[in-house]
Structures are given as C-alpha cells and as structure tokens.
Amino acid sequence: VSGGVNVMTAQYIGAKKDKDVREVVHSAAWMCALMGVILLLFGQVFSKLILEVMKTKEELIDGAALYLRIYFLGMPALGIYNFGNAVFSAVGDTKKPVYILAFSGVVNILLNLFFVIVCRLSVAGVAIASVTSQYMSAVLIMIALMKADERIRFSPKYLKLYPDKAKDLFKLGFPAGIQNAIFQFANLFVQVGVNSFDAVIVEGNSAATNADALVYDVMAAFY
C-alpha cells in the first residue's frame, strides 16, 4: 500500500489536486493501520505453526515463537511508519523519515541493553525493545505529518476510507507487495535448509542475514 501512496500522492500534487491528495493520504493511513492489525492477528495465531513448518530446532522453537508473537505486535506501527515515509518521500522530503528512524534505532539499541542486561528478559526483551521503537517511530512520523505542509497534512477529521482512492492504492501497491512476498517466500526455503543444521549455525545465519539486509538497504537508497 505504501508504494501506491508514494505514486498517487506525487501524481496529485503535480496535478495540483489538493482534495485528491488529502483523500489519498487519509485512505492510506486507514489501510496501512488495518493491514498492520491483520498481520498482528496472523502472527499471534500462526507464529509457532510457521516455525514448525520451517523445521526449527526444538530447543529454539519456544523462544522463537515468543519473539515472533511479541514482534508481530508492532505491525500496526510499522504500517503507519511506512505510510508516513511514503507520503514525505512523495513531496521530496526523505530526511525527516530517516531522522525519525535513526532516533528510534538508537532507542531500540538502548532498550535492548536495558531489557536484556538489566531486566534479563532475553529473547522477550529484544522483541519488546523492537516493538517499542516501532511505535515510537510511528508516533513521531504522525506528529510530523500533523505539522506538515497543508497538502499532505494529516487530520483525524478527514480519516476515512475513500473507496475510489483505496481501490487505486490497492491496484498500485499490490504488485509491489507480491514482488516482495515472492522474494521472502524463496528465502523461507533457504531458512528451512539452514534449520537442518545445529542451533549455533542457525544463530550465525541469522546474524549474517541482518548484515546482508543492512548492505541491501544502503544500496537501495541509490535506486
């Protein structure tokens, strides 16, 4: 959905159709939050089943399921942040979302240290830190949108689903979502193979995957 937000917002701003911009922004906010709630519920119900299908080691599965269930609580916040990021990017403001994400990332690191070292919450502590930082980024980007240029400014009084705009957002965003889903689905097969090894190797692969994601995100900034 966020991909559609970026395209449609930029198009309507270029055409000087402020009413359409407002309808796109507020429809997208509603849709992204709803998608996040759906993913949250999906994660609570199917986290352990997914891990079992992926042949996760018995000694890791309880901790991994706990982590996933807590992490999925942050899906609505992730959806809202991605929505805000797309709106700001549509008007050429790519700095504000980065500053917000960087601040939330620092908070995430500090909370990781606090929950894991001080509170000794282990896996749960890492997940709680991630979710907390995600909601912080969502709140900050919504505050920024409520103070943004009038064309893209978020206002609760306009928050509703405009059917025509929602349909177009879905049509534009769905192909990009499928593309990303196919890539992630392929990675599941790789993970199933990795899970057949010892727990130490699985943990090492997780660390390598995080490093790979960092490199990919840096490259993606230039696309």
Please give the residue ranges for each predicted region.
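Membrane-embedded alpha-helical bundles that form the substrate/pore pathway
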Residues: 1, 7, 66-82, 86, ...
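Alpha-helical transmembrane segments of multi-pass membrane transporters/permeases
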Residues: 32, 87-111, 124, 128-131, ...
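Short alpha-helical transmembrane segments in multi-pass integral membrane proteins
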Residues: 9-76, 118-174
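Small-residue-rich hydrophobic transmembrane alpha-helices
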Residues: 1-40, 78-97, 191, 205-223
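Helix-terminus/linker motif at the lipid-water interface of multi-pass membrane proteins
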Residues: 51-58, 114-121, 181-217
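Hydrophobic faces of transmembrane alpha-helices in multi-pass small-molecule transporters and flippases
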Residues: 68, 72, 95-102, 140-143, ...
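Alpha-helical transmembrane segments of multipass membrane proteins
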Residues: 41, 49, 83-87, 106-118, ...
